[in-house]
């Protein structure tokens, strides 16, 4: 926790942070990891601090069967290239292979346009997504809504929904 303040939740994110620290400025690193760091809320601080110093240039969500020889039908994999330089306007390439069947050979799916989906998005656009999740597939309208619209919590106080006032009278337990 002391050394890896934002990545101590997971050995994977500590590894990413350590590898990035070894890269010279404007240098590149490339890794194949599990993809949980891209979306889960507990990795938000890790994403924020990492993307403040670096830019994802390419990312491929491989999904299941990342390593067929390991029978990896449980862990979802992602391969990415990161540049140790903040470039907000850089248009990164993202490839999603997650839609292919779990048992499919990802090297074949990579060249098959039926399951493969390609996206281009800048680091600026990703900064507008709450939690800095790497949601490269978000449409321009969704990104615009996050950028320009107010959050619900900024407009009203959110709390529990409708309450009965007298649970014993109005709620039946079966």
Regions found by a protein language model. Give the residues of each.
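Signature of N6-adenine DNA methyltransferases within the class I
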Residues: 1-174
């Amino acid at each position: 926790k002391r050394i890896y303040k934002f990545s101590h939740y997971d050995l994977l994110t500590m590894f990413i942070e350590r590898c990035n620290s070894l890269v010279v400025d404007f240098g590149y690193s490339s890794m194949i990891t599990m993809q949980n760091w891209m979306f889960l809320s507990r990795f938000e601080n890790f994403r924020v601090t990492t993307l403040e110093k670096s830019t994802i240039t390419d990312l491929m969500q491989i999904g299941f069967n990342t390593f067929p020889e390991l029978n990896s039908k449980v862990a979802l994999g992602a391969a990415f290239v990161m540049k140790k330089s903040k470039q907000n306007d850089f248009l990164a390439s993202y490839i999603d292979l997650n839609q292919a069947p779990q048992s499919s050979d990802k090297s074949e799916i990579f060249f098959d346009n039926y399951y493969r989906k390609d996206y281009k998005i800048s680091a600026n656009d990703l900064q507008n997504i709450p939690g800095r999740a790497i949601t490269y597939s978000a449409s321009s309208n969704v990104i615009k809504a996050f950028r320009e619209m107010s959050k619900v919590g900024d407009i009203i106080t959110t709390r529990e929904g409708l309450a009965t006032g007298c649970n014993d009278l109005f709620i039946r337990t079966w």
